[in-house]
């Protein structure tokens, strides 16, 4: 029966000792530094399973790098900027039922404690304590002297400095700009503020101004303006509500807003509502159903051609204008709709793009090829549309129907044509969300709003983008394919609203009444970690943190004596801050989940290259997948959540750490399964009991190394080598599998009769060090019971003893396992229990052929045969040889002394398969020896 081990007591004991000894406090010295950070948590709830994965990855790597004698800086701050915490305080104050349920049932907060959290300050204080408790309970090796919150007055001064630097470079600008906006909160919203659709971006629709017979403008919304050359008709939804409205453009002037007449428009009612928020004034003249427009004609402003208005129920009026161009030669939806109306021949198709691999009419071709019968087959139509659009974008070239644009590749036309159409007054821009639903945390549907007098960070600046691309080219990315993703994000980046009217955070230094928003104050804060310990320990006041001070500390500018005098901060402290920044910066690795790629991580690169010299630019980014629980997606409001403290309580910190970092490859999503966590716990319990057993045998005299001793040591040191490589590259799952394999090797060693205390002690000492980054509490406990000095958390990484690595012994043991399995299988099939077993190894000539195969690694059978047949000795075996070569390649046979391996393991094999005797290469029973091949002996039961 398994002895119960009190993991929690072990954890408490070592957490206390680490804290008392302050072993994770990092200070500059003469060692190589290693600075690793993770995106700090937002304090509107407890740390959960998603945080656990994202934060434990750098935690494990930080501990590993300490073993490699690096001076590791690893710490955390807390993000509280913006409106979510304000919103939560209001919901709790108003006793909102859904909120009370979510925070008591899912986040595990006692109701009486939750109901006290009625102000933002109380929420920040409560959840910062909960976060600290979670980090400590999980055994995180953090330097707590550097902790801060983003509403700390001292941190606000740092953010003010950041914004002054951006403004000096012309990267903070004021103007009108489209933003995601909540009408109820009366504020732009960022990812953190959004309940549904947090990944929604702004999409630029081009409104091409077709005109009706009575001179009204009918704007066609499109993402592909080049298709205007292939329009055969336009679609409206006959059942939807449309409006005729007077449209004015709103232009900002010194005297206020000037209205410029922009014609009478016909559009969907929803579109008119949206355009009111996008620099336009709308005066509705009349409302009517779309059916009233059917069979009327409109004029294409680009080609001059008149085309009919036709009905299509697939037209969505909640996106764009509710008026859609029909291009049936290239759009499967349009072709099918026209075919259903029986109008293909009458209206005709107009091709506009030549695409390799397609005929004149790609849409017609793909619809017929896929057998699409009607508009009801939406999945097939969607698939066909995506395929054509992809092929046209990457390989298509505009044809002669595109007038002056003939010969231009599709991928290059959009910006040029859009600019030309706008310059000629034939088109305008309208903004939509990339997702249908975008809902603020307050529950209100968001809109796209053109905000006037708004402050932006000018991420569209081309020179700034060049620097960001340069940085990306020099960085390391895990996984590597992120490099291209970041290049694309930089290219697509547009100006971004950086302030809002309410919320926690830093007051905007250039105009009163604004607060810097949450994705703008969370970009360069790792630099603040390097100096936060001085600010915290020396109780430096906000007013002492001047722009000149930060210029000196982070940029080396200014006179330190003058700054010391003006700020009242002693010169040695200022110089210490500067020294610490230079020593630890840049950040070696920035870790985050993949949801932060399009915002936080991209802004992290942008802001670093704008503010710091090149030597301090980021060196690497690591991104992990999401977390699900028993197949269910995490949700803070609906569940499941799985708080970190619950993991520590139910399973233990070490179990949680080891499981969450090794249950999935880094880029993959990790699905937490509680049964697997229980199994992890059992593995750790067995390891601990093994350590206790070895501790009790201390003082025993070891023996000379036997064959099986040498095998275990070879496996051990080969694993150390491999583990080192995996951990350097954040391949934690592979490192975890390696550790499980080592524990299996130990099991096999003991099954083979291995019991040499010298070997067992060495094995245990090494595996404790390898396990330590994952399971530090248990490893400290085992280290102590073995009588080792100091903390294993500070022990040196095991040295690889190359002299013990022996491929031949390892191959021999692999061979033995295979032979044993073959014998057991034959006994099982024969359904008899033999008294003795005859084993026959291959004839010598077969080994000669294996040698030729090994010397010509990678060659095919066809290439190997002439080489083998050069030797006249082999010719007599004729047809046997191709078959043998094929078998040896498939088996991946190795050259070893099979007889020696079998003789050494004879007693073991007899015991394992339950026979009286095993005879090796004895009397050839039933002519069996002829079927033996290298690495696969023939077997005869008697």
From Swiss-Prot:
InterPro entries assigned to the protein according to its UniProt record, in alphabetical order: aa-tRNA-synth_I_CS (IPR001412), aa-tRNA-synth_Ia (IPR002300), Leu-tRNA-lgase_arc (IPR020791), Leu-tRNA-synth_Ia_arc/euk (IPR004493), M/V/L/I-tRNA-synth_anticd-bd (IPR013155), Rossmann-like_a/b/a_fold (IPR014729), tRNAsynth_Ia_anticodon-bd (IPR009080), Val/Leu/Ile-tRNA-synth_edit (IPR009008)
Main localization, broad class: cytoplasm
One Gene Ontology term of the molecular function aspect: ATP binding
GO cellular component: cytoplasm
Listed GO biological process terms: leucyl-tRNA aminoacylation
Pfam families assigned to the protein according to its UniProt record, in alphabetical order: Anticodon_1, tRNA-synt_1
Residues engaged in binding ATP: 636
Reaction(s) catalysed by this chain's protein: tRNA(Leu) + L-leucine + ATP = L-leucyl-tRNA(Leu) + AMP + diphosphate
Enzymatic class: ligase
Disulfide-bonded cysteines: none
Location of this chain's protein in the cell: Cytoplasm
Signal peptide: none
Membrane spanning residue stretches: none
EC code: 6.1.1.4
Motif 'KMSKS' region, residue range(s) on this chain: 633-637
Keywords attached to this entry: Aminoacyl-tRNA synthetase, ATP-binding, Cytoplasm, Ligase, Nucleotide-binding, Protein biosynthesis
Motif ('HIGH' region): 41-51
Family: Belongs to the class-I aminoacyl-tRNA synthetase family.
Database matches in PANTHER family: LEUCINE--TRNA LIGASE, CYTOPLASMIC, LEUCYL-TRNA SYNTHETASE
Protein name (record): Leucine--tRNA ligase
Annotated organism of origin: Methanocaldococcus jannaschii (strain ATCC 43067 / DSM 2661 / JAL-1 / JCM 10045 / NBRC 100440)
Gene: leuS
């Amino acid at each position: 029966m398994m002895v119960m081990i009190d993991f929690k007591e072990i954890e408490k004991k070592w957490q206390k000792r680490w804290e008392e000894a302050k072993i994770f406090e990092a200070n500059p010295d003469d060692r190589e530094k290693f600075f690793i950070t993770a995106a700090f948590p937002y304090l509107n709830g407890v740390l959960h399973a998603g945080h656990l994965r994202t934060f434990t990855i750098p935690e494990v790597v930080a501990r590993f790098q300490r073993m490699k004698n690096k001076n590791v800086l690893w710490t955390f701050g807390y993000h509280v900027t913006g409106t979510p915490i304000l919103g939560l305080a209001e919901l709790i104050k108003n006793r909102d039922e859904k909120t009370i349920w979510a925070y008591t049932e899912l986040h595990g907060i006692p109701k009486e404690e939750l109901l006290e959290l009625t102000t933002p300050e109380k929420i920040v204080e409560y959840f910062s304590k909960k976060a600290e408790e979670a980090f400590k309970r999980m055994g995180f090796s953090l330097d707590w002297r550097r902790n801060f919150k983003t509403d700390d007055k001292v941190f606000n001064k740092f953010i003010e400095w950041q914004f002054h630097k951006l403004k000096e470079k012309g990267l903070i600008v004021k103007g009108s700009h489209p933003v995601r906006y909540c009408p109820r909160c009366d504020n732009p919203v960022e990812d953190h503020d959004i309940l549904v659709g947090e990944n929604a971006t702004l999409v630029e629709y081009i409104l091409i101004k077709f005109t009706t017979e009575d001179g009204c403008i009918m704007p066609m919304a499109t993402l592909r303006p080049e298709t205007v050359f292939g329009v055969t008709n336009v679609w409206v939804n006959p059942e939807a509500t449309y409006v005729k409205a007077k449209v004015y453009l709103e232009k900002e002037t010194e005297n206020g807003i000037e209205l410029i007449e922009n014609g009478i428009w016909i559009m969907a009612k929803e579109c008119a509502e949206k355009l009111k928020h996008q620099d336009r004034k709308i005066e509705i003249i009349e409302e009517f159903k779309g059916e009233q427009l059917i069979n009327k004609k409109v004029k294409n402003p680009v080609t001059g051609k008149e085309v009919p208005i036709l009905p299509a129920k697939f037209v969505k009026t909640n996106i764009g204008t509710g008026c859609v161009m029909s291009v049936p030669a290239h759009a499967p939806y349009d072709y099918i709709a026209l075919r259903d109306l029986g109008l293909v021949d009458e209206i005709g198709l107009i091709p506009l793009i030549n695409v390799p691999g397609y005929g004149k009419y790609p849409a017609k071709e793909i619809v017929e090829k896929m057998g699409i019968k009607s508009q009801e087959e939406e999945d097939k139509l969607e698939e066909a549309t995506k395929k054509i659009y992809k092929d046209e974008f990457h390989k298509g070239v505009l044809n002669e129907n595109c007038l002056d644009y003939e010969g231009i590749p599709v991928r290059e036309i959009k910006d040029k044509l859009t600019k030309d159409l706008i310059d000629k007054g034939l088109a305008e821009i309208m903004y939509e969300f990339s997702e249908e639903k975008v809902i603020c945390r307050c529950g209100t549907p968001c809109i796209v709003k053109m905000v006037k007098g708004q402050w932006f960070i000018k991420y569209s600046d081309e020179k700034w983008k060049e620097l960001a691309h340069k940085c990306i080219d020099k960085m390391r990315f895990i996984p590597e394919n992120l490099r291209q993703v970041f290049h694309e994000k930089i290219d697509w980046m547009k100006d971004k609203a950086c302030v809002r009217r309410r919320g926690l955070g830093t007051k905007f230094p250039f105009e009163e009444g604004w607060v810097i928003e949450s994705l703008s104050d969370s970009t360069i804060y790792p630099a603040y970690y390097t100096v936060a310990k001085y600010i915290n320990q020396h109780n430096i006041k906000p007013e002492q943190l001047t722009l000149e001070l930060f210029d000196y500390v982070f940029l080396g500018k200014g006179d330190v004596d003058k700054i010391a005098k003006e700020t009242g901060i002693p010169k040695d402290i200022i110089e210490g801050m500067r020294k610490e920044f230079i020593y630890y910066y840049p950040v070696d690795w920035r870790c985050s989940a993949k949801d932060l790629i399009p915002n936080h991580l991209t802004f992290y690169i942008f802001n670093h290259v704008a503010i710091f010299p090149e030597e301090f630019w980021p060196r690497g980014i690591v991104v992990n997948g999401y977390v699900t629980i028993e197949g269910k997606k995490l949700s803070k409001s609906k569940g499941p959540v799985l708080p970190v403290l619950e993991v520590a309580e139910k399973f233990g910190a070490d179990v949680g750490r080891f499981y969450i970092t090794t249950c999935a490859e880094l880029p993959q999503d990790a699905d937490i399964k509680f049964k697997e966590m229980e199994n992890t716990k059992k593995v750790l319990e067995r390891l601990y009991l093994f350590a206790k057993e070895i501790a009790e045998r201390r003082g025993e005299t070891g023996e000379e190394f036997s064959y099986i001793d040498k095998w275990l040591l070879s496996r051990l040191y080969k694993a150390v080598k491999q583990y080192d490589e995996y951990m350097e590259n954040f391949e934690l799952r592979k490192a975890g599998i390696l550790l499980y394999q080592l524990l299996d090797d130990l099991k096999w060693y003991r099954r083979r009769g291995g019991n040499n205390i010298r070997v067992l002690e060495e094995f245990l000492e090494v595996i404790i060090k390898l396990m330590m980054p994952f399971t530090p509490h248990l490893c400290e406990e085992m280290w102590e019971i073995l009588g080792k000095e100091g903390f294993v958390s500070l022990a040196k990484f095991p040295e690889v003893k190359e002299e013990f690595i022996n491929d031949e012994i390892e191959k021999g043991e692999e061979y033995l396992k295979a032979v044993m399995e073959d014998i057991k299988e034959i006994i099982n099939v024969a359904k008899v229990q033999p008294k003795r077993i005859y084993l026959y190894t291959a004839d010598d000539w077969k080994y000669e052929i294996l040698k030729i195969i090994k010397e010509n690694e990678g060659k095919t059978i066809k290439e190997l045969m002439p080489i083998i047949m050069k030797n006249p000795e082999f010719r007599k075996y004729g047809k046997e040889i191709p078959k043998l070569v094929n078998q040896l390649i498939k088996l991946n046979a190795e050259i070893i002394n099979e007889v020696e391996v079998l003789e050494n393991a004879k007693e073991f094999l007899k015991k394992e398969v339950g026979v009286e005797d095993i005879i090796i290469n004895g009397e050839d029973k039933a002519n069996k020896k002829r079927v033996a091949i290298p690495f696969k002996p023939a077997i005869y039961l008697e």
